[in-house]
Amino acid sequence: MTNAKSKKEYLNRICKVQDYIEEHLHEPLSLDELSNIAGFSKFHFHRIFKAIEKETLAQYVNRLKLENATAFLIHRTDMTVTDIAHYFGFTDSAVFSRAFKNYYKISPIKYRNNYS
């Protein structure tokens, strides 16, 4: 990202990928798919994404999943924690609960009880 024009182009490409991620957050996302959307090689995409976002693609996607899961915990009381975990692509509720607690410092069940 040496000049302003290429930096703007890179930002536009990354924004396009971010929009795609947000629209497909509950679906499996692959590096191949996302790098193709950005029009970069996998290696270049991963490097540019981290340079712009200051977090890896995996960290970004996990953070978005956890942030969106909070709304589900509060407003989708018809869904169990396991249902929410599976909806956002976690392999099971234990993996989801561990990631949630690491990020929010509270378990998903306690979060739901405190805020719903």
Where are the language model's segments positioned?
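The short coil/loop that forms the "turn" connecting the two helices of the helix-turn-helix
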Residues: 40, 90-91
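…primarily DNA-binding HTH/wHTH and HhH modules…
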Residues: 1-8, 12, 74, 98-116
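Terminal helix-turn-helix DNA-binding modules in bacterial transcription factors
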Residues: 15-32, 52-87, 115-116
